[in-house]
């Protein structure tokens, strides 16, 4: 159960998890931009799978932060 209220933007109702998804997506893009020049993707077997797991971990951490 989230402590955030339901957001209403231009008459559209968004659940509280929507803010957590957007924050984790923004943090994912920043972190990916930082990791690409370091060359860590050369050691990753499947970059798309790595990105999905990274986003999942970030979403979990942010959702635990807000709950």
From Swiss-Prot:
GO terms for cellular component: plasma membrane. Its main location: membrane. InterPro entries: DUF1656 (IPR012451). Keywords: Cell membrane, Membrane, Transmembrane, Transmembrane helix. It comes from the Bacteria. It is found in: Cell membrane. Signal peptide: none annotated. Pfam families: DUF1656. It is a multi-pass membrane protein. The chain crosses the membrane at residues 3-23, 43-63. Belongs to the AaeX family. This is Protein AaeX. It comes from Yersinia enterocolitica serotype O:8 / biotype 1B (strain NCTC 13174 / 8081). The gene is aaeX.
